[in-house]
């Protein structure tokens, strides 16, 4: 069984003006597709062929891990975004954020700061720890919470290819616009799972 590039949950121009169609064309259409292609080539004829993406991420290393994790991370990231989204979470998610960070404003400030300070290429995550508390975690390169006992709720991609076309080297500007796209409904479903 080969992996395929999952369909975006919206049109490539749907996130504009925050993330341009050109960025989606490269980030999704080229980078994400390349990870899928590389993964398929790397697992051919190995014990990983026929396994689920999550199982491969949890049990592999090296090139197979890097490509599998990047396929998973990107798919998760696209679902964390939505057109006409943003604002603040409500219900149990809002309560959990307030319990763990004091307020939504404090969470947003801490998450943004962690993403800005995430050195080099990587991901910044909101996760639910094994004890049920929410935490902000930054990973490098293809790192993912799937290899831990934490449940990923939200992520932002801070590899330069995620924002360079629209924001050049201004990661803080990208993060400011990221908040206008956060799909809180998806994040809430992850918390409830």
Swiss-Prot record:
Its cofactor is Fe cation. Keywords: Iron, Metal-binding, Oxidoreductase. It holds the Pfam family Sod_Fe_C. One of its GO terms (molecular function) is superoxide dismutase activity. InterPro entries: Mn/Fe_SOD, Mn/Fe_SOD_BS, Mn/Fe_SOD_C, Mn/Fe_SOD_N, Mn/Fe_SOD_N_sf, SOD_C_sf. Its EC number is 1.15.1.1. It catalyses: 2 superoxide + 2 H(+) = H2O2 + O2. Coiled coil: none annotated. Binds 1 Fe cation per subunit. Fe cation binds at residues 27, 74, 157, 161. It comes from the Bacteria. Gene3D superfamilies: Fe,Mn superoxide dismutase (SOD) domain, Iron/manganese superoxide dismutase, C-terminal domain. Belongs to the iron/manganese superoxide dismutase family. Destroys superoxide anion radicals which are normally produced within the cells and which are toxic to biological systems. Homodimer. NCBIfam families: PRK10543.1. This is Superoxide dismutase [Fe]. It comes from Salmonella typhimurium (strain LT2 / SGSC1412 / ATCC 700720). The lineage of its organism: Bacteria, Pseudomonadati, Pseudomonadota, Gammaproteobacteria, Enterobacterales.
């Amino acid at each position: 069984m080969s992996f395929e590039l999952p369909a975006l949950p919206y049109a490539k121009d749907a996130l504009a003006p925050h993330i341009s169609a050109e960025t989606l064309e490269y980030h999704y259409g080229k980078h994400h597709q390349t990870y899928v292609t590389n993964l398929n080539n790397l697992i051919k004829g190995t014990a990983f062929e026929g396994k689920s993406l999550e199982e491969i991420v949890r049990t592999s290393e090296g090139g197979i891990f890097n490509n599998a994790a990047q396929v998973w991370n990107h798919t998760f990231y696209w679902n964390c975004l939505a057109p006409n989204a943003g604002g603040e979470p409500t219900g149990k998610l809002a309560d959990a954020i307030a319990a763990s960070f004091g307020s939504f404003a404090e969470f947003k400030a801490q998450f943004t700061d962690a993403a800005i300070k995430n050195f080099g290429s990587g991901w910044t995550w909101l996760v639910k720890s094994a004890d049920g508390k929410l935490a902000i975690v930054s990973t490098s390169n293809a790192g993912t919470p799937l290899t831990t006992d934490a449940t990923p709720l939200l992520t932002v991609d801070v590899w330069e290819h995620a924002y360079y076309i629209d924001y050049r080297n201004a990661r803080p500007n990208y993060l400011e616009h990221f908040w206008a796209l956060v799909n809180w409904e998806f994040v809430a479903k992850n918390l409830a799972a």
